[in-house]
Structures are given as C-alpha cells and as structure tokens.
Regions:
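Extracytoplasmic/periplasmic beta-strand context in beta-sandwich domains
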Residues: 10, 48-49, 93, 204
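Serine-hydrolase catalytic core recognition
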Residues: 29, 72-302
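Generic short beta-strand segments
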Residues: 35-36, 143
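Short, solvent-exposed loop/turn segments at conserved positions within beta-propeller repeat blades
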Residues: 41-46, 88-91
Length: 307
C-alpha cells in the first residue's frame, strides 16, 4: 500500500494458501521474504516454508526452501546468503547455507544425538486423519513408550488445546517435549492433534469453524481422530481413553468428558476457562462472536447432567 494515500500498489500473493510472517524486506532489491503454508502439494501444511515475492510484480512468488520440513531461516544483510535449519518431529535438524536462489551451497555440522538414542529416547511420529466431517485432513503427533511393543495394547491419552490462535501440535525436532514424552513412559500412547477452528494457518474456512460456538467446536474432531487411530493401530485400546489440557485445553478436556462420557474414561483439566462468555471478551467476541442466545449456558446445563 501507498502510505501517503492508502491506495493498493500491488498484491504480492494470491491463491488458496496462507502467507505467514514476513522475515525481511529488501528495499533496494525490491523483494520481500516470508513464510507460507499449504502452497506446495505433498508438503505438510503446517511446515514453515520460505518464499520470496517481488514488491513491484503481482503474484511473483518463488519457493526458496523446498524440503518437506519446517524451516527456520536467517537471511544475511547482503541478501546473498541464508542459513536454514530444517527438521520434522522425527527428522533431526539439517543445517545448510543457501544462496539467494535457495540453492544449498554448504552443509553445516549435524547434531550428534547418539547418546540420547542409546538412553532409549525415541522420536514421536506425525500422523494424518480426517475430521468428523470425513473430508478435512487433520494432523497430529504420537508418542510411544521407550519400551513400546506392538503386540501389546496401550491406553491412549489426548493432550488438547482448542486454539483459536494456534494448535499445540509440534512440527520440529526436539528432545525436550517433556510432558508428552514423560507421560508416554508411564505406559500410554499420547497424542496431540489439530482440529477445525484451531489455527489460522489452514486458511479462513478452517479457522472460522468455531465461530458462534464457544465451546463444542473441537470435541467431535478429537473423538473421531482417536477412533481412527484405534482402528488403524491394534496396539491402541479404545476402551481406555484419557484427555487433558491446560487453559483452553482445560476447558476442552472437561467439556469432552461431559459431552462424551461413554468414550473418555478420565480427564484432567488445568486452569480451564470454562465459560468463554466471561473470559477475555476481546478475543472471544473476535473469534467466536457474541453468545446472544445463551447457547453456552444451555449446553453447559445439558452436559453437566452427565457428571
């Protein structure tokens, strides 16, 4: 936009994908560098992918980091080079230097994680299932016990957070996801999975799914995701299902066991905002609307009868 007149000068991106954070603007070379999600077929729509756009040409977007992984890029002051560290939850970080065109010109040192593996640590696994509509793809991560035995059957616990700003579903490699990893070592399959309404990273329709529904929008997707995983993997015991979360996850876990008491066996709710009508009106009205018909109050009364 022209800052003096407010008039649109150029539309830099277009299409059914999401343009994310701007990392750098080259005012001399007339280029903008930014992360995007969901543009490339076959690449996880949650991965941070770096693009270059021309400030003076509409929709002149160039992919700079093509690997199917989440990228963290630092661009040099001269814009001639960039350092890229990319990974997935199960792929160790790869650190490279690229030229301005995205071509890898040097591979930097790799981390030595052999001592961690020798201690019994295992990377989690990313999975994909369908939402309760049977159409929308949902993405999640699964942790297993270090002594996992595929011939045994394990209870499953879902670590939840309803959004709407982000989904607590890791995309990058780490050995420090302590809560899920520790819980798995107690003999559980632990998952966290995204759901409709959880994040703007999947586009407007996905993000706005929870509008006019302050509480129930994520519940059916979590339940259906677990049912699909149990049907896919015989080592999951679908009769022993737990759910837990903090803050929004606290309200979601409590709402889930009250809504589906015959499905969830146990729930742990930490610091839940159980009535969004009286919690932080600013973000609630922006993302969920105004509860003019007291829908939340009526549904709360109905579901609490399941206690």
């Amino acid at each position: 936009y022209d800052t003096a007149t407010g008039n649109l000068k150029n539309q830099l991106t277009d299409g059914t994908w999401v343009a994310g954070p701007v990392t750098k603007i080259d005012t001399i070379g007339r280029k903008m560098y930014f992360y995007g999600y969901g543009r490339e077929k076959g690449i996880d729509p949650y991965y941070y992918i770096l693009y270059e756009a021309q400030l003076d040409r509409p929709n002149a977007v160039r992919l700079l980091t093509p690997e199917n992984a989440s990228h963290d890029v630092s661009i040099s002051p001269s814009y001639r080079y960039m350092v890229d560290s990319y990974s997935t939850v199960s792929q160790e970080p790869v650190n490279v230097v690229r030229n301005r065109n995205g071509k890898v010109i040097m591979t930097l040192e790799k981390p030595d994680l052999q001592p961690v593996y020798e201690m019994g640590w295992k990377a989690p696994e990313r999975f994909k299932v369908k939402a309760a509509d049977g159409v929308t793809d949902l993405y999640g991560v699964m942790w297993k016990p270090a002594d996992f035995d595929s011939t045994k059957v394990y209870p499953i616990i879902s670590n939840v957070y309803p959004g709407p700003f982000f989904e607590y579903v890791p995309t990058r490699f780490t050995i420090n996801d302590v809560y899920n990893t520790r819980l798995a070592q107690l003999g559980f399959i632990v998952i966290t999975v995204g759901h409709r309404g959880g994040t703007p990273m999947r586009g407007k329709a996905y993000h706005a799914y929870g509008y006019n529904n302050m509480r129930d929008y994520p519940l059916a997707d979590d339940k259906y995701a677990i049912e699909q995983l149990a049907a896919r993997y015989p080592f999951i015991d679908a009769t022993k299902v737990g759910i837990y979360g903090h803050s929004g996850g606290g309200f979601m876990s409590a709402a889930a066991i009250c809504t589906y008491p015959d499905f969830y066996s146990a729930a742990v709710s930490s610091a839940g905002n159980h009535d969004n009508r009286i919690y932080n009106k600013g973000f609630v009205e922006i993302h969920f609307g105004v509860d003019a018909v007291s829908y939340t109050h009526l549904r709360a009364h109905e579901t609490l009868m399941n206690l």
